[in-house]
């Protein structure tokens, strides 16, 4: 009898538990193009700190180079601008306009304008990309890679040279944008929009 009572209690408990409505889980809303969305976000952040760096550093430091073996501050900005055309022309399936900014521009105003123009050219590649179109294969540096890989390579290149510029800025006692809490708060607010 005791075993029967325990069995009835267990069955009743199970029935009550199973009869309850399952908790409603809120599933995350899937983003239509999660890979390109993240790549675009990463690019946008790199672009923001690069432009802020170019604007923040005084023109007198544009010719600064820590050693003779490396590019000057201004040459790095020109190189990054040239690279925007290189990477993004491949991603867009266009001929590289190759403006040769690194070799032809040296003033702060000219380099900032060139950098803004180069980023505007690249913006179109990032904005027009989807996860599907990003999987299309293209040739880059002799390798067949997906278009999205080209844009990821561009992001990596921006980050690499931003790292160079951070060192140059620190050598001149300038706080880089990524270490400026007010600037980073501003960036985070724009990302959340």
Q: How should each PLM-predicted stretch be described?
A:
Residues 56-62, 126-135, 171-177:
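Surface-exposed helix-capping loop/turn segments at secondary-structure junctions
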């Amino acid at each position: 009898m005791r075993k029967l009572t325990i069995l009835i209690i267990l069955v009743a408990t199970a029935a009550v538990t199973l009869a309850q409505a399952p908790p409603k889980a809120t599933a995350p809303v899937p983003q239509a193009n999660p890979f390109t969305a993240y790549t675009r976000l990463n690019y946008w952040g790199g672009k923001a700190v690069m432009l802020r760096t170019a604007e923040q550093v005084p023109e007198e430091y544009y010719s600064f180079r820590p050693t003779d073996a490396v590019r000057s501050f201004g040459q790095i900005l020109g190189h990054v601008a040239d690279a925007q055309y290189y990477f993004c022309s491949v991603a867009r399936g266009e001929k590289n306009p190759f403006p040769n900014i690194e070799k032809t521009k040296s003033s702060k105003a000219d380099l900032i304008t060139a950098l803004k123009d180069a980023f505007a050219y690249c913006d179109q590649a990032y904005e027009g990309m989807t996860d599907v179109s990003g999987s299309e294969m293209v040739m880059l540096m002799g390798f067949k890679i997906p278009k999205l890989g080209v844009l990821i390579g561009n992001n990596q290149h921006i980050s690499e040279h931003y790292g160079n510029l951070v060192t140059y800025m620190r050598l001149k006692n300038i706080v880089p944008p990524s270490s400026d809490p007010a600037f980073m708060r501003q960036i985070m607010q724009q990302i959340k929009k």
